[in-house]
């Protein structure tokens, strides 16, 4: 089981926020969100939505999605706060063709107009205030050409899984056959819509690492209101990248809002 080393922790830069070197070191580990079976359907949909226009990924990270899009010959730009994450984009095919700007996705602007702005893998929730999330929508809309679209992929909070009177839901329990393992759990504050995602990794020798990342969840209806504030209107909402319908059993949604051709 891999994990950040003490040297990685020593290199962490506070300017990288919640995704410094110690996180970036493991971010591209095989499997999970990096599995080609997960990535390729996403890239297919995004490429189709972009058509002949340019794409902008907010919170581009290590280029998990942006690099494969660029490898297909698409014009891809990205905004990312963490230099440690961005340093890994060029390790991927197509990564050297992604134009990255270091900055905050709530306010950083890049040149040009885009047919698609997108924000995937729950990253809207990394913005932990309602005003900040609204600012993301406003910034996305400012980058869109008329008729352009803003796409978000985000999980639905597992509030129905909370035991009565409790605030914690485990999402992964993964023992390692070699010893140790990994446990992940979310802790919710249903009053403020804040939650923390907690990650505990234990190695075979008994040493471990704990990481906590704060989030703010927003229901689809709240995101639609944010979109309206930004001048966007809902175009599609799916349960997953296969475009299946959103149901009461869905654990996430992929939502797309469109910028009108005129006011």
Give residue ranges: language-model regions.
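Class I SAM-dependent methyltransferase SAM/SAH-binding core
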Residues: 62-107
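A short acidic, Gly/Pro-enriched loop at the edge of an enzyme's catalytic core
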Residues: 109-116
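A short glycine-rich, Lys/Arg-flanked "PGG" loop and its adjoining helix->strand segment in the class I
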Residues: 134-146
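SAM-dependent methyltransferase
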Residues: 151-228
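C-terminal lobe and adjacent flexible extensions of AdoMet/dcAdoMet transferase-like proteins
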Residues: 218-263
């Amino acid at each position: 089981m891999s994990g950040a080393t003490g040297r990685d922790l020593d290199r962490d830069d506070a300017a990288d926020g919640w995704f410094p070197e110690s996180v970036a070191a493991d971010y591209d580990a095989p499997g999970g969100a990096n599995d080609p079976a997960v990535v390729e359907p996403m890239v297919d949909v995004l490429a189709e939505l972009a058509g002949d226009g340019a794409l902008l990924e907010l919170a581009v990270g290590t280029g998990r999605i942006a690099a494969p899009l660029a490898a297909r010959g698409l014009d891809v730009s990205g905004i990312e706060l963490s230099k440690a994450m961005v340093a890994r984009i060029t390790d991927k095919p197509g990564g050297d063709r992604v134009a990255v700007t270091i900055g905050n996705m709530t306010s950083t602007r890049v040149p040009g107009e885009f047919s698609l702005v997108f924000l995937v893998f729950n990253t809207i929730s990394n913005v932990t205030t309602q005003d900040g999330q609204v600012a993301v929508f406003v910034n996305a809309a400012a980058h869109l050409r008329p008729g352009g679209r803003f796409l978000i992929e985000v999980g639905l909070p597992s509030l129905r899984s909370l035991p009565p009177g409790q605030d914690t839901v485990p999402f992964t329990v993964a023992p390692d056959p070699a010893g140790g393992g990994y446990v992940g759990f979310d802790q919710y504050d249903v009053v403020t819509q804040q939650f923390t995602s907690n990650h505990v990794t234990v190695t075979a020798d008994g040493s471990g690492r704990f990481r906590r990342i704060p989030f703010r969840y927003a229901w689809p209806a709240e995101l639609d209101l944010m979109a309206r504030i930004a001048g966007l209107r809902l175009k599609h909402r799916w349960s997953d990248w296969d475009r299946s319908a959103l149901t009461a059993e869905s654990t996430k949604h992929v939502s797309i809002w469109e910028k009108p051709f005129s006011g």
